[in-house]
Amino acid sequence: MQKMFRADIVLVSFLLLVAGAGASHALTAEQNTAVRFLKTGMEQLKVVEYQAARDSFEQALRYDDSSAAAHLGLGIASFHLHDDSYAERQLMRAAELNPRDATPYQVLGELYYRKDDLESAASFWEKAVALAPDAADLRSRLERIRKEHRTEKDFNRDVTSHFLVKYEGREKIEAGRIILRILEDAYGEVGRGLSYYPDRELQVILYSGRQFQEVTDAPGWSGGIYDGKIRIPIGGIEQETPGLRKLLYHEYTHAVVRSITPRCPTWLNEGLAQYFEGHEIDSRQKVALNRIAQAGKLPALSDLEGSFMGLGNSQAMYAYLFSLSSVRYMVDSFGMYRVKTLLEELGKGADTGKGISNGIMISYEEFERGWKRSLE
């Protein structure tokens, strides 16, 4: 399953900073020009046009190098473009210019977290929490990173050209190698299916069942999660099993989808993950879907766009079934090429409705009606 997370969690506070730019005093002509570029960059960030946003913030700084908001925006855009050293310089400069703002430290924490430097990430988030003590999300994030660091600080590592796996104890070396082999297979197969191969190393962390629950707070029905890293509870893995292969393909698909777009409705994300793991809808499930469709009780797909994390066992079972059913209908009716186009449209900032209309060339409503009719 995918755990909902946002690498652009700082955007709201950044928008407030931009809105207040220059509001407290009269601006020079150059500062006014800088604010115009600043607001353009803000709009480009909102629609995930990171390179264009970076260019706009750099233009703003040519007119006003003392703008904390422009340095912050440039740091955020560069963070998303994975230009980490440049992002860090801009974020540190933003913190110097506006020492009461927690946002630069928040993004720096995300940057070091992505680099797997958990100790440095925690240090930056501690600074952010000190500046924004009422930010519950920040405090929660800091507590989780502390749990991760305590749990993983002595883990072993193994790598391939595409993956880094972390695990505790030499007895899990073979388990790590089995998992890496399966993930390399997934890299090829899912890549061929979606015509997309991520070019950045993906981390995979293997936990005991207790460690998994402590670090992730995942629901009991979850066999693994993807939250920027693949996290899996494992027992004594000694050989590949069909269940392990399905689980790894499922979570790896989430990583691929996330790499294409940070904005994917959960029904589409979970449906694709089940599709690529090879999950089939069995005869009992087909009967259940038909019965629900005949009764007119299939949910609106818009109701399945948010996280499934808070669902109970039965609710989650049906949410996943509806997700797989709708995605299989989409692939069978329009082809995987159109599904990939839909994901790319979402990656450009389109909402689900616009993404579907641009991707598969019919409206969200028409797609949903077609899916529901196919089950009757």
Predicted regions and their residues:
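Juxtacatalytic substrate-recognition/specificity segment
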Residues: 154-265, 276-285, 291-298, 302-311, ...
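Conserved structural position within tetratricopeptide repeats
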Residues: 58-62, 92-96, 127-130
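Structural signature of tandem alpha-helical TPR/SEL1-like repeats
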Residues: 46-56, 80-93, 114-124
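Pan-zinc metallopeptidase signature
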Residues: 302-376
